[in-house]
């Protein structure tokens, strides 16, 4: 299996195919139509930004506003407003695609750290070529962003537990905090879905400590 994976990544034709797929993802983001709830999420980002920039003076009421405070949608709206009105939908899709691609690379790094580089490369290929994920990369500003937050929080949590340097640990803490705020803004129960991950790493951390103590004796 490792030889096959190395062959895939060292094969120029396969690498060219991956590059083409990246460009195809961008192409799809530009030409694809509007998702059924995209305009609502963009409006949510607009309302939140107006509220923040006006220091609470502009307080628009929209449906489910009390359930969402998505920093991601606010950030996306800020980027979208840099483009002409006729191209704001495409800009929204490109922002979503960018974070979806970061999700793929995040999974590669996480799988590489948990197992080895070959498994990381394989996870990269599987997720990239997975039709359901690829189809949602541009138009879904909820599930793909939740996946982005999940994967990178898990990766930084793993690095936090393994790193003994206090400065490095603090760096991981604020990154995890930012990602957690992104996730909870989209889905309130986001942190609850991380409980299995936290339990797994706690057991891993305790087991590693016990193993090191036994070695010292």
Language model features by range: what are they?
Residues 25-27, 123, 172-187:
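Membrane-interface alpha helices of multi-pass inner-membrane proteins
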Residues 106, 110, 146-165, 179:
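Specific aromatic-rich, kink-prone transmembrane helix
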Residues 123-128, 135, 155, 180, ...:
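Short helix- or helix-capping micro-motifs
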Residues 30-36, 54-77:
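Membrane-proximal lumenal/periplasmic loop motifs of glycosylation machinery
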Residues 15, 94-114, 152, 156:
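Transmembrane-helix motifs of polytopic, lipid-linked glycan transferases
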Residues 13-16, 89-90, 107-129, 148, ...:
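Transmembrane-helix signature of polytopic, membrane-embedded enzymes
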Residues 66, 70, 74, 84-102, ...:
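Loop-to-helix entry region of an early transmembrane alpha helix in multi-pass inner-membrane enzymes
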Residues 1-4, 159-166, 193-217:
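Perimembrane helix-loop-helix junctions
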């Amino acid at each position: 299996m490792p030889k096959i994976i190395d062959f895939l990544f060292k094969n120029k034709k396969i690498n060219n195919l991956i590059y083409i797929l990246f460009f195809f993802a961008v192409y799809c983001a530009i030409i694809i139509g509007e998702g059924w709830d995209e305009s609502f999420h963009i409006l949510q980002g607009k309302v939140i930004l107006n509220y923040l920039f006006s220091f609470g003076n502009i307080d628009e009421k929209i449906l489910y506003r009390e359930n969402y405070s998505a920093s991601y949608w606010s950030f996306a709206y800020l980027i979208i407003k840099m483009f002409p009105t006729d191209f704001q939908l495409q800009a929204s899709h490109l922002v979503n695609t960018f974070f979806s691609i970061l999700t793929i690379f995040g999974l590669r790094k996480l799988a590489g750290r948990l197992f080895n580089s070959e498994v990381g490369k394989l996870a990269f290929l599987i997720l990239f070529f997975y039709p359901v994920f690829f189809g949602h990369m541009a138009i879904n500003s909820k599930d793909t962003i939740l996946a982005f937050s999940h994967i990178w929080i898990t990766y930084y949590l793993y690095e936090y537990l393994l790193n003994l340097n206090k400065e490095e640990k603090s760096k991981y803490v604020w990154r995890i905090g930012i990602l957690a705020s992104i996730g909870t803004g989209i889905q309130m129960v986001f942190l609850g879905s991380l409980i299995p991950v936290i339990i797994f790493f706690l057991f891993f951390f305790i087991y590693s400590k016990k193993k090191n103590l036994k070695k010292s004796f």
